[in-house]
């Protein structure tokens, strides 16, 4: 996100990273699981039995990270992704989820969410590890990070954070931000931080309008058994749609093959329906940018 509306940065930690929430992480894992052709749906009887068991695990107070409203958003996303004939959860079960999950600890919540991706143990372990990092930051929505995340000592781009297809090791020290104040530092593995980052916020030095942000939404080409980072990138448009963003979307690249057209069109139509007024006098919200290098012509 390029913005003119940027607070005065900390010299040692000038970068701003906006993180996924726990609920958004669940949505990404749902999307990731449903990119697999052989996903097994959990039977309703199993879900009911699990819910009965988890009721005994309620904590005296709600555990930070998710609330009933966010569970409702997950339910809507799940229903959009799963064909009606394969849905094993109705309104009653989702209501029980919304009432129960905010009062469960993180491990129990991971077991509950795993019902939405066929109780695949590897996915559940991966989700739980990422969710633990979110809790380590105090469920902060924003972090302050050092410039070394992007460039080296010679101001040259570094591999890793912006190139998720490259395996990187090491950790980076960041500070959660709350009420414009830096909180206690946390050390997070670089690859994990890249997965949990929803937006990298950069200052726009020059701009026509001071109150306009520009968001670059990456769109990796679909592939069989995609890695998690690709599923996250392809989920981003859904995430912005749920927030009724952006005001205007500009399509700057073509699909790599005709087989991708139907899925891409469905995502764009869904975005238009939820974010645009539909009035004939309204300015267009979906715009195609045509360049000399456009693959469509």
Question: Model-derived features: where do they sit?
Answer:
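Long, low-complexity, polar/charged, intrinsically disordered or flexibly structured peripheral segments
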Residues: 67-223
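Inter-motif core of Ras-like GTPase G domains
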Residues: 224-256
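Short acidic, S/G/P-rich loop/turn micro-motifs used as interaction or catalytic elements
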Residues: 220-222, 254-260, 293-296
């Amino acid at each position: 996100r390029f913005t003119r509306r940027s607070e005065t940065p900390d010299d040692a930690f000038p970068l701003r990273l906006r993180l996924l929430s726990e609920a958004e992480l669940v949505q990404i894992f749902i999307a990731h699981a449903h990119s697999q052709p052989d996903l097994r749906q959990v039977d309703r009887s199993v879900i009911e039995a699990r819910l009965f068991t988890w009721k005994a695990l309620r904590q005296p107070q709600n555990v930070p990270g998710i609330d009933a409203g966010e569970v409702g958003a997950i339910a809507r996303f799940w229903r959009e992704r799963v064909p009606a004939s394969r849905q094993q959860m109705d309104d009653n079960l989702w209501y029980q989820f919304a009432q129960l999950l905010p009062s469960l600890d993180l491990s129990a919540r991971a077991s509950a969410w795993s019902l939405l991706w066929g109780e695949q143990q590897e996915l559940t372990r991966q989700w739980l590890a990422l969710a633990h990092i979110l809790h380590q930051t105090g469920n902060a929505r924003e972090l302050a990070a050092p410039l070394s995340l992007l460039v080296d000592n010679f101001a040259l781009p570094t591999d890793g954070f912006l190139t998720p297809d490259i395996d990187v090791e090491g950790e980076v020290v960041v500070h959660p931000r709350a009420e414009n104040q830096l909180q206690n530092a946390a050390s997070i593995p670089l690859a994990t931080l890249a997965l949990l980052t929803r937006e990298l916020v950069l200052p726009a030095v020059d701009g026509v309008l001071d109150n306009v942000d520009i968001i670059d939404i990456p769109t990796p080409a679909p592939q069989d058994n995609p890695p998690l980072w690709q599923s996250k990138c392809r989920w981003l448009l859904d995430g912005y749609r749920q927030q009724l963003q952006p005001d205007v979307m500009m399509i700057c690249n073509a699909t790599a093959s005709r087989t991708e057209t139907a899925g891409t069109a469905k995502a764009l139509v869904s975005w238009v329906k939820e974010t645009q007024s539909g009035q004939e006098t309204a300015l267009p919200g979906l715009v195609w940018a045509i360049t000399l290098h456009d693959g469509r012509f």
